[in-house]
C-alpha cells in the first residue's frame, strides 16, 4: 500500500499526513495540492465549456434579434475576411 511506503511502521495513516509528505516531496504547499488535482482540472474545463456554451447561446440570440439588413452586412464582412485569409494563405 502507498501509505506503508510513504510512512513505514504506522498501522493507520491519516490522509493529511500523506498529503503533507507528498507536498514536502514535491516542494509545494499541501493546501494547493487540492486545487491542482485532475478532478479540479476537469471541473475547470467543464466550467469553461459551459460558459462558452452560454456565450454562444447569447450571441445567437443577439444575432437573431438583429434586423435582416444588419445580419446580411455582418455575413458579408465575415465572408470578405475569410476570403482575404484564404488568399493570404495561398500566396
UniProtKB/Swiss-Prot annotation:
Pfam family, one: Ribosomal_S24e
InterPro entries: Ribosomal_eS24 (IPR001976)
Superkingdom classification of source: Eukaryota
One of the protein's GO biological processes: translation
GO molecular function: structural constituent of ribosome
Family membership noted in the UniProt record: Belongs to the eukaryotic ribosomal protein eS24 family.
Sorted UniProt keywords: Ribonucleoprotein, Ribosomal protein
Ribosomal protein recorded as keyword: yes
Cellular component terms per the entry's GO annotation: ribonucleoprotein complex; ribosome
Name under which the protein is recorded: Small ribosomal subunit protein eS24
Region (Disordered) location: 51-91
Keyword Transport found: no
